[in-house]
Curated annotation (Swiss-Prot):
Its main location: cytoplasm. The keyword Zinc does not apply. It comes from the Bacteria. It comes from Listeria innocua serovar 6a (strain ATCC BAA-680 / CLIP 11262). This is PTS-dependent dihydroxyacetone kinase 1, dihydroxyacetone-binding subunit DhaK. It is found in: Cytoplasm. The keyword DNA damage does not apply.
Length: 329
């Protein structure tokens, strides 16, 4: 295992310290916690909290700041943060109008965020929760009941963040979030696995000429293994599955996110994005916005995911285009 670390037991602690020291103009650490909170406070605004296991950087701390999240909670690598840590995030985000929790659909995350919401309720903080389940690869897995929450979560952060910044109520934000979640679909592929520092070996093995379709962001293997193929053919496989799930038709408008899994160069991501654009053009589907880059990773996994957000409301594009002050958007 080759990693730039000072040992495996302090990796998250030192990452959090490095992050807040590097971006002290945007975020700060809530003392005694692994909560990253935005510096600017807006009384009367609904707070937005997300988080989960570390190892997916820049998610989620990279999306804390004006226009997006109020706070993010960092668990151990690929491990949900504890309810008490999440509760600290809720308190940091609360500005008197309630707090919305944006949770990826993993059993530990959902359970711990719900427990934290109960703690907040006992402290008279109104909390609502939405659960992102955009991964169409599998219905149930080692980590989930139902579909997993993956890169589409970042689009949810951005749209909900814009609405919150504009003064939407807690109930309005929850309803909007549920609409966006229902319209966003993701599917990923791995060219090589990742290694959790404390484990010391890859989560699965792939031959030099193999790829894994349907991988998760915790190093979970996918639903099928195939030989390496040209980008255009790979794009077609992922696109066709997503198109079928989303029932995309000629004339529909979409947002595309090509997300690097951690070790795939931008050159390859843009080659893939070009192939996706050709497929959408041939299908008569109009692309309103495209995002390409590492938005939600899986440590040093090589590969990418394709996310397509079907626009049920054209205002969502405007929300995605609004400027923010965060580390990673």
């Amino acid at each position: 295992m080759k990693k730039i670390l000072n040992g495996t037991d302090q990796v998250v602690e030192q990452m959090v310290e490095g992050l807040v020291k590097s971006h002290a103009d945007v975020v700060h650490r809530v003392e005694g916690t692994r909560v990253i909170a935005r510096n600017d406070k807006r009384p009367g605004k609904v707070g937005l909290v997300s988080g989960g296991g570390s190892g997916h950087e820049p998610a989620h701390a990279g999306y804390v700041g004006r226009g997006m999240l109020s706070a993010a909670v960092c668990g151990d690598v690929f491990t949900s943060p504890t309810p008490d840590q999440i509760y600290e995030g809720i308190k940091a985000a609360d500005q008197g109008a309630g707090v919305l929790l944006i949770v990826k659909n993993y059993t530990g995350d959902v359970m711990n965020f719900e427990m934290a919401a109960d703690l907040a309720d006992a402290d008279d903080i109104k909390v609502e929760q939405i659960v992102v389940d955009d991964d169409i690869a599998v219905e149930d897995s080692t980590f989930t009941t139902g579909r997993r929450g993956v890169a589409g979560t970042v689009l949810v952060h951005k749209i909900i963040g814009a609405a919150a910044e504009a003064g939407a109520s807690l109930e309005e934000l929850k309803a909007l979030g549920e609409k966006v979640i229902a319209s966003v679909k993701t599917l990923g592929v791995a060219l090589s696995p990742c290694t959790v520092p404390e484990v010391g070996h890859p989560g699965f093995e792939l031959g030099d000429d193999e790829i894994e379709l349907g991988i998760g962001i915790h190093g979970e293997p996918g639903f099928t293994r195939e030989k390496i193929m040209p980008s255009a053919r790979l794009a077609k496989q992922l696109y066709e599955r997503i198109s079928s799930e989303s029932k995309l038709l000629a004339g529909d408008k979409v947002v595309v996110l090509v997300n690097g899994m951690g070790a795939t160069p931008l050159m390859e991501q843009y080659v893939f994005a070009n192939d996706v654009h050709e497929l959408l053009k041939n299908a008569g589907v109009q692309v309103e916005k495209t995002l390409v880059g590492d938005y939600m990773t899986s440590l040093e996994m090589a590969g990418l995911s394709l996310t397509i957000l079907k626009l049920e409301d054209e205002k969502w594009v405007d929300m995605l285009k609004l400027p923010v002050d965060t580390i990673a958007w």
